């Protein structure tokens, strides 16, 4: 597991500054929509699954014109990769297609998104260190805080857990995403 280093933080901040200087970001075409970013370590298991589940809920409720989601990882080593094959298979079995390409959290994600959802305590701490302002740090929440059917304080990384780990994570994310969606809709 990669810990954030000062060089990693500086790299992310520098990319943010370069982005602001370019002034042409429109990746998601999401002006005037509520924007949610799901974050895990590598953006190949938990966060793309959360994004897929959340987007499914948004579509079921015909709210695509009001709410959008994306996902990213603290670690950039998987950038450009598809979600883990085991997660894609487990998600597809439940009706969720995961077509996301992994990417690393970018400095400009903080002002761009309304809510940034961390999968575990380390992701949360890393995001808090990356947040460029106190205002941006208030957007960071733990996914586990939206769980109502499960008594667990974080979403575990299923990477080394076997097939039952992927199933557990999907159970947790379905619970959390459903409640997250409901809490967002109340604010719109």
Regions found by a protein language model. Give the residues of each.
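Helix N-cap/beta->alpha junction signal
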Residues: 47, 120-121
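Conserved active-site segments centered on acidic
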Residues: 2-112, 182-188
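Phosphate-binding/catalytic loops
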Residues: 3-16, 115, 121-188
